[in-house]
Amino acid sequence: VTADKGLPRWFPRNATRGWIHAEYSLLPGSTNTRFRRERNGAKGRTHEIERLVARSLRGAVDLEALGPISMTVDCEILNADGGTRCASITAGNIALRLAIRRLIASGRCLPINLRGSEQDLKDGWTPPDLTSKERADHESAVMANDVAALSVGMVDGKVRVDLDYVLDSNADVD
């Protein structure tokens, strides 16, 4: 997870809330036959997976409590054997929580009432040091819940979870 310096260009100027974005990529050796890297941005399936992962993760974060920080969750698939969307959401959640914890510890992510104004920042304002309890409380405010995903399908009339590629390909419903 990378915390960017600013918010996306399309965000309102002087926004007080943050944004979570996801990027998803199958590495060339992640499938049985070599998968060619996508050029010039994500295409159909990849773009839709990125949107699903980002929406899922934004659902676990209070973007106002996060503050004006843009974060990108990178989902690099090393071994694609079914369930890559679910793995991206679950692992992305863990990585996002750890990144938020680091931002809080560094003073970049502060409770709303402790944030410096734009003028304060220009004047060289120093963020306050939070106690360990204040850091834990703010982490809970920013990310009160975790999110995880699990694939479910109906294969030969039986409900199955965590489908691999073969089961997913043969599922009646997934």
Task: Provide a role label for each language-model segment.
Residues V1-D174:
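Polyanion-binding surfaces on beta-sheet-dominated domains and ring/shell assemblies
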